[in-house]
Curated annotation (Swiss-Prot):
Functional pathway: Amino-acid biosynthesis; L-tryptophan biosynthesis; L-tryptophan from chorismate: step 5/5
Classification lineage: Bacteria, Pseudomonadati, Pseudomonadota, Gammaproteobacteria, Vibrionales
CDD domains: Tryptophan_synthase_alpha
Name recorded for this polypeptide: Tryptophan synthase alpha chain
Family annotation (NCBIfam families): trpA
Matching Pfam families: Trp_syntA
Reactions that this protein is recorded to catalyse: (1S,2R)-1-C-(indol-3-yl)glycerol 3-phosphate + L-serine = D-glyceraldehyde 3-phosphate + L-tryptophan + H2O
Gene3D superfamilies found in the cross-reference section: Aldolase class I
Enzyme class at the top of the EC tree: lyase
Length: 269
Protein backbone atom coordinates (compact mmCIF):
# COMPACT_ATOMS: atom_id res chain seq x y z
CA UNK A 1 0.00 0.00 0.00
CA UNK A 2 1.34 3.48 -0.75
CA UNK A 3 2.15 6.16 1.80
CA UNK A 4 -0.88 8.37 1.10
CA UNK A 5 -3.30 5.46 1.31
CA UNK A 6 -1.72 4.25 4.54
CA UNK A 7 -1.92 7.75 6.01
CA UNK A 8 -5.58 8.28 5.09
CA UNK A 9 -6.54 4.82 6.38
CA UNK A 10 -4.69 5.40 9.65
CA UNK A 11 -6.28 8.82 10.19
CA UNK A 12 -9.79 7.65 9.26
CA UNK A 13 -9.53 4.91 11.88
CA UNK A 14 -8.87 7.64 14.49
CA UNK A 15 -11.56 10.00 13.13
CA UNK A 16 -8.90 12.51 12.10
CA UNK A 17 -8.13 14.48 8.98
CA UNK A 18 -4.68 15.20 7.60
CA UNK A 19 -2.90 18.48 8.15
CA UNK A 20 -0.28 19.12 5.48
CA UNK A 21 2.02 22.16 5.57
CA UNK A 22 3.72 23.56 2.46
CA UNK A 23 7.15 25.20 2.42
CA UNK A 24 9.60 26.07 -0.33
CA UNK A 25 12.74 23.90 -0.22
CA UNK A 26 15.78 26.05 0.60
CA UNK A 27 13.84 28.89 2.25
CA UNK A 28 15.53 30.84 3.79
CA UNK A 29 18.65 28.66 3.28
CA UNK A 30 19.07 24.94 2.57
CA UNK A 31 20.39 24.35 6.13
CA UNK A 32 17.57 26.21 7.87
CA UNK A 33 15.08 24.59 5.51
CA UNK A 34 15.99 21.16 6.89
CA UNK A 35 15.48 22.42 10.46
CA UNK A 36 12.10 23.83 9.43
CA UNK A 37 11.02 20.51 7.91
CA UNK A 38 12.17 18.65 11.04
CA UNK A 39 10.05 21.06 13.11
CA UNK A 40 6.98 20.55 10.89
CA UNK A 41 7.23 16.78 11.27
CA UNK A 42 7.96 16.87 15.01
CA UNK A 43 4.97 19.18 15.58
CA UNK A 44 2.47 16.85 13.93
CA UNK A 45 2.46 17.36 10.14
CA UNK A 46 0.85 14.31 8.53
CA UNK A 47 2.51 14.80 5.14
CA UNK A 48 4.75 17.38 3.48
CA UNK A 49 4.03 19.48 0.41
CA UNK A 50 7.28 21.03 -0.83
CA UNK A 51 8.07 23.58 -3.52
CA UNK A 52 11.10 23.61 -5.79
CA UNK A 53 11.97 27.29 -6.24
CA UNK A 54 11.37 28.68 -9.71
CA UNK A 55 12.06 32.20 -10.97
CA UNK A 56 8.53 32.86 -12.28
CA UNK A 57 5.92 31.38 -9.91
CA UNK A 58 2.65 32.27 -11.65
CA UNK A 59 0.08 30.77 -9.30
CA UNK A 60 1.72 32.03 -6.13
CA UNK A 61 0.83 35.08 -4.12
CA UNK A 62 3.44 37.50 -2.71
CA UNK A 63 4.31 35.38 0.36
CA UNK A 64 5.39 32.29 -1.56
CA UNK A 65 7.02 34.39 -4.29
CA UNK A 66 9.19 35.98 -1.59
CA UNK A 67 10.08 32.51 -0.24
CA UNK A 68 11.10 31.44 -3.73
CA UNK A 69 13.39 34.48 -4.09
CA UNK A 70 15.01 33.79 -0.69
CA UNK A 71 15.61 30.16 -1.63
CA UNK A 72 17.09 31.03 -5.05
CA UNK A 73 19.31 33.72 -3.51
CA UNK A 74 20.66 31.21 -0.97
CA UNK A 75 21.78 28.93 -3.81
CA UNK A 76 18.91 26.43 -3.85
CA UNK A 77 19.10 24.73 -7.24
CA UNK A 78 17.06 21.69 -8.32
CA UNK A 79 20.14 19.55 -7.56
CA UNK A 80 20.21 20.89 -3.98
CA UNK A 81 16.45 20.24 -3.72
CA UNK A 82 16.81 16.58 -4.71
CA UNK A 83 19.70 16.14 -2.25
CA UNK A 84 17.51 17.54 0.54
CA UNK A 85 14.53 15.41 -0.55
CA UNK A 86 16.71 12.29 -0.35
CA UNK A 87 17.72 13.27 3.20
CA UNK A 88 14.09 13.96 4.20
CA UNK A 89 12.99 10.58 2.86
CA UNK A 90 15.80 8.78 4.74
CA UNK A 91 14.77 10.49 8.00
CA UNK A 92 11.02 9.98 7.56
CA UNK A 93 10.46 6.69 5.71
CA UNK A 94 6.65 6.67 6.14
CA UNK A 95 5.88 10.36 5.56
CA UNK A 96 4.08 11.17 2.28
CA UNK A 97 6.14 13.76 0.38
CA UNK A 98 4.59 15.77 -2.44
CA UNK A 99 6.13 18.34 -4.76
CA UNK A 100 4.22 21.40 -5.91
CA UNK A 101 5.95 23.08 -8.81
CA UNK A 102 5.95 24.47 -12.36
CA UNK A 103 6.27 22.74 -15.73
CA UNK A 104 9.41 24.65 -16.77
CA UNK A 105 11.41 22.85 -14.09
CA UNK A 106 10.20 19.51 -15.43
CA UNK A 107 10.94 20.45 -19.05
CA UNK A 108 14.43 21.71 -18.13
CA UNK A 109 15.37 18.36 -16.63
CA UNK A 110 13.47 16.39 -19.29
CA UNK A 111 10.14 14.87 -18.28
CA UNK A 112 11.39 11.30 -18.01
CA UNK A 113 14.57 12.31 -16.13
CA UNK A 114 12.61 14.49 -13.74
CA UNK A 115 10.22 11.73 -12.65
CA UNK A 116 13.09 9.27 -12.32
CA UNK A 117 14.85 11.75 -10.00
CA UNK A 118 11.65 12.05 -7.96
CA UNK A 119 11.42 8.27 -7.63
CA UNK A 120 15.11 7.99 -6.67
CA UNK A 121 14.65 10.67 -3.98
CA UNK A 122 11.55 8.97 -2.55
CA UNK A 123 8.96 11.55 -3.64
CA UNK A 124 5.35 10.26 -3.59
CA UNK A 125 3.50 12.82 -5.69
CA UNK A 126 3.95 15.75 -8.06
CA UNK A 127 1.49 18.58 -8.69
CA UNK A 128 2.44 20.80 -11.63
CA UNK A 129 0.57 24.04 -11.04
CA UNK A 130 0.57 25.31 -14.62
CA UNK A 131 -0.37 22.09 -16.46
CA UNK A 132 -4.13 21.68 -16.89
CA UNK A 133 -5.46 18.14 -16.80
CA UNK A 134 -6.20 18.07 -20.54
CA UNK A 135 -2.51 18.77 -21.29
CA UNK A 136 -1.12 16.39 -18.70
CA UNK A 137 -0.72 13.16 -20.63
CA UNK A 138 3.07 13.11 -21.12
CA UNK A 139 3.57 14.00 -17.44
CA UNK A 140 1.11 11.31 -16.32
CA UNK A 141 2.78 8.64 -18.43
CA UNK A 142 6.20 9.40 -16.92
CA UNK A 143 4.73 9.65 -13.40
CA UNK A 144 3.07 6.26 -13.75
CA UNK A 145 6.24 4.68 -15.12
CA UNK A 146 8.17 5.72 -12.00
CA UNK A 147 5.44 5.12 -9.43
CA UNK A 148 4.76 8.81 -8.73
CA UNK A 149 1.18 9.99 -8.13
CA UNK A 150 0.08 12.80 -10.47
CA UNK A 151 -1.91 15.28 -8.38
CA UNK A 152 -4.64 17.33 -10.02
CA UNK A 153 -6.52 20.40 -8.88
CA UNK A 154 -10.30 20.43 -8.49
CA UNK A 155 -11.25 24.13 -8.77
CA UNK A 156 -14.33 25.54 -7.00
CA UNK A 157 -16.10 26.21 -10.32
CA UNK A 158 -15.27 22.81 -11.87
CA UNK A 159 -17.80 21.12 -14.12
CA UNK A 160 -18.78 17.55 -13.37
CA UNK A 161 -16.77 16.52 -16.43
CA UNK A 162 -13.61 18.11 -14.99
CA UNK A 163 -14.18 16.48 -11.61
CA UNK A 164 -14.61 13.13 -13.37
CA UNK A 165 -11.25 13.58 -15.17
CA UNK A 166 -9.52 14.67 -11.95
CA UNK A 167 -10.94 11.61 -10.20
CA UNK A 168 -9.95 9.13 -12.89
CA UNK A 169 -6.50 10.48 -13.76
CA UNK A 170 -5.20 11.64 -10.38
CA UNK A 171 -3.62 9.56 -7.63
CA UNK A 172 -2.52 10.00 -4.02
CA UNK A 173 -4.87 12.84 -3.16
CA UNK A 174 -6.98 15.46 -4.93
CA UNK A 175 -6.00 19.12 -4.40
CA UNK A 176 -9.31 20.84 -3.76
CA UNK A 177 -9.23 24.59 -4.25
CA UNK A 178 -11.22 26.64 -1.79
CA UNK A 179 -11.28 29.56 -4.24
CA UNK A 180 -9.87 30.70 -7.57
CA UNK A 181 -6.86 33.00 -7.89
CA UNK A 182 -3.34 32.90 -6.48
CA UNK A 183 -2.21 31.29 -3.24
CA UNK A 184 -2.13 33.29 -0.04
CA UNK A 185 -3.22 33.57 3.54
CA UNK A 186 -4.03 37.16 2.60
CA UNK A 187 -7.24 35.91 0.95
CA UNK A 188 -9.34 33.53 2.97
CA UNK A 189 -10.76 30.25 1.76
CA UNK A 190 -14.04 30.78 -0.02
CA UNK A 191 -17.00 28.70 -1.12
CA UNK A 192 -18.59 25.79 0.70
CA UNK A 193 -16.98 22.62 -0.60
CA UNK A 194 -19.45 19.91 0.35
CA UNK A 195 -20.93 19.60 -3.18
CA UNK A 196 -17.43 19.33 -4.68
CA UNK A 197 -16.44 16.62 -2.21
CA UNK A 198 -19.67 14.74 -2.92
CA UNK A 199 -19.04 14.87 -6.67
CA UNK A 200 -15.43 13.70 -6.26
CA UNK A 201 -16.58 10.86 -4.00
CA UNK A 202 -19.17 9.83 -6.60
CA UNK A 203 -16.35 9.50 -9.15
CA UNK A 204 -14.08 7.59 -6.70
CA UNK A 205 -11.49 10.38 -6.61
CA UNK A 206 -8.40 10.15 -4.42
CA UNK A 207 -9.10 11.76 -0.99
CA UNK A 208 -9.52 15.54 -1.17
CA UNK A 209 -7.22 17.96 0.66
CA UNK A 210 -8.46 21.55 0.76
CA UNK A 211 -5.89 24.24 -0.03
CA UNK A 212 -5.55 27.99 -0.77
CA UNK A 213 -6.16 30.47 2.04
CA UNK A 214 -6.04 27.95 4.90
CA UNK A 215 -4.57 29.88 7.82
CA UNK A 216 -6.68 29.12 10.92
CA UNK A 217 -7.55 25.96 12.87
CA UNK A 218 -11.30 26.59 12.36
CA UNK A 219 -10.81 26.26 8.59
CA UNK A 220 -9.14 22.86 9.01
CA UNK A 221 -12.04 21.67 11.15
CA UNK A 222 -14.63 23.02 8.68
CA UNK A 223 -12.88 21.36 5.72
CA UNK A 224 -12.90 17.96 7.40
CA UNK A 225 -16.48 18.34 8.63
CA UNK A 226 -17.48 19.11 5.01
CA UNK A 227 -16.01 15.80 3.89
CA UNK A 228 -12.43 16.67 2.91
CA UNK A 229 -9.74 14.24 4.06
CA UNK A 230 -7.68 17.16 5.35
CA UNK A 231 -6.22 20.57 4.58
CA UNK A 232 -3.03 22.06 3.16
CA UNK A 233 -1.61 25.34 4.45
CA UNK A 234 1.15 27.12 2.56
CA UNK A 235 1.23 30.89 2.76
CA UNK A 236 0.38 30.97 6.47
CA UNK A 237 3.34 28.66 7.20
CA UNK A 238 5.70 30.58 4.92
CA UNK A 239 4.59 33.88 6.50
CA UNK A 240 5.94 32.64 9.85
CA UNK A 241 9.32 32.03 8.20
CA UNK A 242 9.22 35.52 6.64
CA UNK A 243 8.30 37.19 9.93
CA UNK A 244 11.18 35.57 11.83
CA UNK A 245 14.11 35.73 9.42
CA UNK A 246 16.34 37.44 11.97
CA UNK A 247 15.57 34.95 14.78
CA UNK A 248 15.72 31.31 13.73
CA UNK A 249 14.87 30.01 17.20
CA UNK A 250 11.66 32.07 17.30
CA UNK A 251 10.93 30.94 13.74
CA UNK A 252 11.03 27.26 14.71
CA UNK A 253 9.09 27.86 17.95
CA UNK A 254 6.32 29.75 16.14
CA UNK A 255 6.16 27.20 13.33
CA UNK A 256 5.87 24.40 15.87
CA UNK A 257 3.01 26.13 17.69
CA UNK A 258 1.14 26.83 14.44
CA UNK A 259 1.44 23.22 13.26
CA UNK A 260 0.30 21.87 16.65
CA UNK A 261 -2.76 24.17 16.64
CA UNK A 262 -3.70 23.29 13.06
CA UNK A 263 -3.18 19.56 13.64
CA UNK A 264 -5.30 19.65 16.81
CA UNK A 265 -8.18 21.02 14.70
CA UNK A 266 -7.99 17.97 12.41
CA UNK A 267 -9.07 15.66 15.23
CA UNK A 268 -12.84 15.35 15.19
CA UNK A 269 -14.28 14.42 18.55
Amino acid sequence: MDRYQELFNRLAAKNEGAFVPFVTIGDPTPEQSMKIIDTLVASGADALELGIPFSDPLADGPTIQAATIRALESGTTPIVCFELLTQIRAKYPDMPIGLLMYANLVFTAGIETFYKKCADAGVDSVLIADVPIKESEEFRVAAEKYGIHPIFIAPPNATDETLKSVSELGGGYTYLLSRAGVTGAETKAGKPIRHLVESLTKHNAPPALLGFGISEPAQVKEAIEAGAAGAISGSAVVKIIENNLSDHTAMLDNLGQFIRDMKAASKLS
